[in-house]
């Protein structure tokens, strides 16, 4: 099996994400998946570090002649992602209705065709990120919301809604989809990061 896509991820050096990068890498090696995982310097906040996602993806699309499967670094591959090579679209990610928020774009697993349309989409995503700095308690400013806005603006961009097993949040989706076996499971390290950095003991992020 020789995939035509490259799995990519990045993490902030000297943080808890560094250990998780090793877990992700081992899971990719289990299925002989070509991958590139990059370490970056801390940009000053979790919000800025997450907004780096679009820049990172742009860099890879411009430097590689491959389609890209981006995953957050706290993810692990549980089986070979058979769906990905067969996708006939420009972009694919999961849009999910949660009880606390509907129509939520999940950018933790994101497939991108390496073509000019997608590159224009990523440029627009970056523009939206730069226009409104992310704020932790305002989901409408998060990078994934800007990604969704950019995708919906571009009516010629072919979108596919990934099934839940490809962006399987380890606890919430286990309850929502009890009979679904995850292909790519996400462990939501951002929750721990927020708890450590917030002085309010009752603080909780729904992600």
Predicted feature locations:
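Catalytic core and acceptor-binding pocket of nucleotide-sugar-dependent glycosyltransferases
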Residues: 119-207
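N-terminal anchoring/stem segment of glycosyltransferases
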Residues: 1-66, 116, 185-196, 200, ...
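GT-A fold catalytic core of metal-dependent nucleotide-sugar glycosyltransferases
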Residues: 51-119
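A structural signal for well-ordered alpha-helical scaffolds and beta->alpha junctions
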Residues: 17, 21, 50, 103, ...
């Amino acid at each position: 099996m020789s995939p035509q896509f490259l799995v990519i991820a990045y993490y902030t050096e000297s943080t808890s994400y560094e250990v998780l990068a090793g877990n992700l890498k081992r899971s990719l090696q289990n299925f002989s998946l070509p991958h590139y995982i990059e370490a970056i310097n801390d940009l000053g906040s979790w919000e800025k570090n997450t907004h780096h996602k679009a820049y990172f993806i742009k860099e890879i699309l411009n430097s590689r002649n491959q389609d890209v499967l981006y995953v957050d670094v706290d993810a692990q591959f549980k089986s070979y992602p058979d769906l990905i090579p067969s996708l006939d679209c420009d972009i694919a990610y999961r849009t999910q209705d949660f009880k606390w928020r509907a129509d939520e774009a999940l950018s933790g697993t994101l497939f991108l065709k390496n073509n000019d349309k997608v590159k224009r989409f990523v440029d627009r995503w970056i523009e939206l990120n730069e226009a409104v700095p992310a704020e932790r308690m305002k989901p409408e400013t998060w990078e994934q919301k800007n990604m969704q806005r950019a995708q919906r603006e571009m009516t010629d961009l072919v979108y596919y809604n990934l099934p839940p097993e490809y962006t399987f949040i380890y606890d919430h989706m286990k309850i929502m989809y009890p009979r679904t076996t995850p292909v790519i499971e996400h462990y939501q390290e951002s929750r721990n990061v927020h708890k450590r950095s917030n002085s309010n003991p009752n603080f909780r992020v729904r992600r």
